[in-house]
């Protein structure tokens, strides 16, 4: 649609303004009928039954994707409010100093961030896991886990996995400098880990002490991952959890919508970017 005001167009064409109107655009999902709300509710419940931690925005994205619908986000919210399906609002309390920098990057493979998190099991075991996530496309493309505490050697193996996942197993180093962002955990700051990162072409950077917000993308991922997958799962022992991890990471990459990606999953977003780059 032109950005020239309609009044100006009418003056140029020498016609009366009251006789000209913008052609209204049809809704992608058709006309709005409240009689169809029971069907919308059924589709919403098909999502929330398996994704009880999803708020209305992510439910809206999943319903439209799964059922190829074109519902407005506000309609999904109204139906969920009407039938008591809305999540209780979460209160986020900020502690420590604010992070004023920008973690996200304008393109993929400019900055990767990594972190370690723990999953306590009912048996008393604690599973340690580490991951690598791209600071642009949000894909978790490498991870490792063990029922023992992770070491610097595990992180160096994780670096190899990240390199091969993005650039192929024949690559000995990344084709261009990529920042490797982590906290100050001993696995990451060990001299051997720092030197190995440089060998691979990575540029290791760490967050300031007592400032986890500076690795906020990794922190946010851990919070989301635990809420959406770990909480309420079968956590009998480390072996049971380890058997589920691959499926959880795969679902996160292929299905979970991200607001930063226009409510697309990281796989959908990367596929679109690949199509765009190949068409140029």
Locate predicted features.
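Charged DNA-binding/catalytic regions of mobile-element recombinases
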Residues: 1-280
């Amino acid at each position: 649609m032109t950005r020239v005001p309609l009044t100006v167009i009418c003056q140029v064409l020498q016609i009366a303004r009251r006789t000209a109107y913008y052609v209204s655009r049809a809704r992608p999902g058709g006309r709005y009928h409240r009689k169809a709300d029971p069907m919308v509710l059924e589709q919403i419940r098909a999502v929330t039954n398996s994704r009880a931690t999803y708020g209305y925005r992510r439910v809206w994205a999943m319903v439209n994707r799964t059922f190829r619908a074109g519902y407005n986000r506000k309609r999904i919210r109204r139906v969920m409010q009407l039938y008591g399906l809305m999540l209780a609002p979460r209160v986020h309390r900020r502690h420590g100093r604010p992070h004023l920098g920008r973690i996200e990057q304008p393109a993929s493979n400019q900055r990767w961030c990594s972190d370690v998190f723990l999953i306590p099991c009912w048996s008393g075991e604690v599973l340690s896991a580490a991951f690598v996530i791209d600071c642009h496309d949000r894909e978790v493309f490498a991870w490792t886990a063990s029922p023992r505490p992770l070491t610097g050697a595990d992180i160096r193996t994780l670096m190899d996995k990240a390199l091969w996942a993005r650039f192929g197993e024949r690559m000995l180093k990344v084709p261009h400098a990529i920042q490797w962002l982590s906290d100050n955990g001993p696995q990451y700051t060990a001299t051997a880990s720092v030197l190995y990162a440089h060998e691979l072409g990575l540029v290791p950077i760490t967050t300031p002490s007592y400032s986890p917000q500076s690795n906020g993308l990794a922190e946010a991922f851990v919070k989301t991952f635990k809420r959406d997958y770990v909480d309420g799962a079968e956590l009998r022992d480390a072996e049971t959890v380890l058997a589920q991890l691959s499926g959880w990471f795969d679902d996160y990459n292929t299905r979970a919508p991200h607001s930063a990606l226009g409510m697309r999953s990281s796989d959908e977003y990367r596929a679109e970017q690949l199509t765009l780059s190949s068409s140029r």
